[in-house]
Amino acid sequence: MAEELVKPYNGDPFVGHLSTPISDSGLVKTFIGNLPAYRQGLSPILPGLEVGMAHGYFLIGPWVKLGPLRDSDVANLGGLISGIALILVATACLAAYGLVSFQKGGSSSDPLKTSEGWSQFTAGFFVGAMGSAFVAFFLLENFLLSMAS
């Protein structure tokens, strides 16, 4: 039974990828294909903006609820400042990855695999993450939320 479900990818056991009913399903392939980094025909700044917006928005909540200022009146501001610091670190890491991974002036059919494309992705990430972090802060500050533990 296990032989029928899990088999080597493309029949080659040395590839290092197992083909399972989950990883080979059309639903999973469609979902992965629609992630921002894999969408075709977009400028690299747009996937970066989308990824940044998602990350900036969800980084603030854990800092507000679980951070060291969680029981104070400035928990939201503390969460914003901590989130901004983490976004800056993530942006620096993305920039460093681009510098060491892609040759200047290299050509590729995928814009995200060039130095210029990765730089645009990083810029989009930074703008999206900062914007959505401030949106999350605004929502937390201006809407009464239950603080019951």
From Swiss-Prot:
It comes from the Bacteria. Coiled coil: none annotated. The chain crosses the membrane at residues 80-100, 125-145. Keywords: Membrane, Photosynthesis, Photosystem I, Thylakoid, Transmembrane, Transmembrane helix. It is found in: Cellular thylakoid membrane. It is a multi-pass membrane protein. The keyword Transmembrane applies. GO terms for biological process: photosynthesis. GO terms for cellular component: photosystem I reaction center; plasma membrane-derived thylakoid membrane. InterPro entries: PSI_PsaL, PSI_PsaL_sf, PSI_suXI. The keyword Repeat does not apply. Belongs to the PsaL family. PANTHER family: PHOTOSYSTEM I REACTION CENTER SUBUNIT XI, CHLOROPLASTIC. This is Photosystem I reaction center subunit XI. It comes from Synechococcus elongatus.
